[in-house]
Amino acid sequence: MALLKVKFDQKKRVKLAQGLWLMNWLSVLAGIVLFSLGLFLKIELRKRSEVMNNSESHFVPNSLIGVGVLSCVFNSLAGKICYDALDPAKYAKWKPWLKPYLAVCIFFNVILFLVALCCFLLRGSLESTLAYGLKNGMKYYRDTDTPGRCFMKKTIDMLQIEFKCCGNNGFRDWFEIQWISNRYLDFSSKEVKDRIKSNVDGRYLVDGVPFSCCNPSSPRPCIQYQLTNNSAHYSYDHQTEELNLWLRGCRAALLNYYSSLMNSMGVVTLLVWLFEVSITAGLRYLHTALESVSNPEDPECESEGWLLEKSVPETWKAFLESFKKLGKSNQVEAEGADAGPAPEAG
């Protein structure tokens, strides 16, 4: 028994074809939106590629760009099919291709759904990418004279100012690295010598942070050096007083920014997916309604349309059987090829 059977007369078939034509062209616009969102996210990620570990984070924007292009192509073609469906002569050329096209549409809908899920689920991968990339970027902060790294100081400073953050996980991350270049250290100074000697790796470590960590909203002038030395500043206690620095780490700030972007894009992609599913269902109804016309010479006669020719269990069983037959036929062909040509009679 057919699933979700609906009766159609000529008027209903015309309305269905016209409605699907309009929906397909709206879906082309939705594809352009997906393409634009993917392009925007890719540009945003490239802006901060210096503080990201690898290109894994570009999977989501690349996927959005890909499904956006495919959506435009498939729905333009579907719009043409719906436009030609009302003319028997034009419809005849599409008839052999409709079933394969519907199968491709179903496969595309599955891909679109997976892309939407990726928008929500790739937060963990992005977090590890940012953590490692920011850690390396901070190490190169002092290398203003090194070719290929001279831009890193500006990149980190602009990042901390724009996102109101400091360090990787917090401002104390700057205490663990030498972020002041040796070029600007006075090695004749006893303080500099003592600090370098006291460190196993011979690095100049200070309890200070770059100027970009300072919060301009703080009423007190920025304290960026000797942050843990209470006696170095008047009326100051670093353990109880709220520091005039950004307390949030840049990893959390960037992760929240990109996660909110991808979550919004995931919602848009899910809405487009629902729209595409409804179009695929409509195309199936149009296809079966035109196929079941009892008298092709009488366009006014009634016909029936359905989503599945049989029930869901029966359809699944038939699919598995056809899949097994395909596997067996491939196996027979492979065995025949291995056996080689038959020997000639002597």
Swiss-Prot record:
Question: Which compartments is it annotated to reside in?
Answer: Membrane; Cell projection, Cilium, Photoreceptor outer segment; Photoreceptor inner segment
Example of a GO MF term: protein homodimerization activity
Q: Which residues are glycosylated?
A: N53, N229
Q: Give the source species.
A: Mus musculus (Mouse)
Q: Name one GO cellular component term.
A: membrane
Record-annotated membrane-spanning stretches? 25-43, 62-80, 100-123, 265-290
GO BP, sorted A to Z: cell adhesion; detection of light stimulus involved in visual perception; photoreceptor cell outer segment organization; protein heterooligomerization; protein homooligomerization; response to low light intensity stimulus; retina development in camera-type eye
Its family remark reads:
Belongs to the PRPH2/ROM1 family.
Q: What does this protein do?
A: Essential for retina photoreceptor outer segment disk morphogenesis, may also play a role with ROM1 in the maintenance of outer segment disk structure. Required for the maintenance of retinal outer nuclear layer thickness. Required for the correct development and organization of the photoreceptor inner segment.
* Protein name as it appears in the record: Peripherin-2
Phenotypic consequence of gene deletion: Knockout mice fail to form retinal disk structures, resulting in an absence of the photoreceptor outer segment. At postnatal day 14 the photoreceptor inner segment is stunted and at postnatal day 21 shows disorganization and cell lysis in addition to outer nuclear layer degeneration resulting in a gradual decline in photoreceptors. At postnatal day 21 mice show progressive thinning of the outer plexiform layer and disorganization of the photoreceptor synaptic termini.
State the annotated membrane topology for this chain: Multi-pass membrane protein
Residue ranges annotated as Lumenal topological domain? 44-61, 124-264
Interaction with MREG as annotated region, ranges:
341-346
Keywords noted in UniProt: Cell adhesion, Cell projection, Disulfide bond, Glycoprotein, Membrane, Sensory transduction, Transmembrane, Transmembrane helix, Vision
Tissue pattern of expression reads: Expressed in the retina (at protein level).
SUPFAM superfamilies assigned to the protein according to its UniProt record, in alphabetical order: Tetraspanin
Q: Does the keyword Signal apply?
A: no
Please name the gene that encodes this protein: Prph2
Q: Oligomeric state and partners?
A: Homodimer; disulfide-linked. Forms a homotetramer. Forms a heterotetramer with ROM1. Homotetramer and heterotetramer core complexes go on to form higher order complexes by formation of intermolecular disulfide bonds. Interacts with MREG. Interacts with STX3 isoform 3B. Interacts with SNAP25.
User: What is the associated disease?
Assistant: Responsible for retinal degeneration slow (Rds).
- Those parts of the protein on the Cytoplasmic side are 1-24, 81-99, 291-346
